[in-house]
């Protein structure tokens, strides 16, 4: 069999990528989160045929949805989509990969899933979020859901709010993002959790910060 070089887990499903860039999934698929075009569970890894002609470079699993980034910068999502966390512009579940559209100049470099929301980081160092947002976890200054990627202004060079962070001596982002699978999430510069006084992104509006022992981190390697 093929050697697996990447692995990510959702709640009850697993995603793996082989050394050749082929994508495999297995586990529970009630909401189509395996991406095989149906809602059938699989006990062993099955190749995602819809992406057989693409080389997968990054993967992430949400509670009931899955995201995959290909080597040419295309982002795909599938599975449970009640809150738009797949990013396909609708709220219907997807049992096959659906491409997530970004502005042409915003090539995706990283992706990470939360419980019911998703984050992406582009080569231009902009952060986009979509999915469940009623606890403020999308970082858009609103408590609404989004079914397409929306830039987080305050954390993105192309966002008008980024100047406010610069004036507060915010530290720059490194090449990795971490996401909690729950309502809380964090964008962590230099792989360090925000300290008191640092500017941090956070979910639940009652949280003053996201301390290390309060974040179950999911790592997306560059």
Model-identified regions with their sequence ranges:
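Eukaryote-biased RCC1-like beta-propeller repeat architecture
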Residues: 1-222
């Amino acid at each position: 069999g093929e050697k697996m070089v990447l692995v990510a887990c959702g709640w009850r499903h697993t995603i793996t990528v082989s050394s050749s860039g082929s994508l495999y999934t297995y586990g529970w698929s009630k909401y189509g989160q395996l991406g095989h075009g149906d809602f059938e569970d699989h006990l062993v890894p099955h190749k995602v045929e819809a992406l057989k002609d693409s080389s997968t470079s990054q993967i992430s699993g949400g509670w009931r949805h899955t995201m995959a980034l290909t080597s040419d910068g295309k982002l795909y999502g599938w599975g449970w989509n009640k809150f738009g966390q797949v990013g396909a512009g609708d709220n219907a579940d997807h049992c096959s990969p659906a491409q997530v559209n970004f502005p042409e100049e915003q090539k995706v470099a990283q992706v990470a899933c939360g419980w019911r929301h998703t984050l992406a980081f582009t080569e231009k160092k902009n952060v986009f979020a979509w999915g469940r947002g009623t606890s403020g976890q999308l970082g858009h200054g609103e408590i609404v859901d989004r079914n397409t990627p929306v830039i987080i202004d305050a954390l993105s060079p192309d966002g008008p709010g980024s100047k406010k962070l610069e004036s507060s001596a915010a530290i720059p982002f490194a090449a990795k993002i971490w996401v909690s699978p729950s309502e809380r999430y964090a964008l962590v510069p230099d792989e360090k959790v925000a300290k008191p006084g640092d500017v941090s992104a956070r979910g639940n509006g009652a949280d003053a910060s996201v301390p290390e022992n309060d974040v179950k981190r999911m790592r997306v390697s560059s």
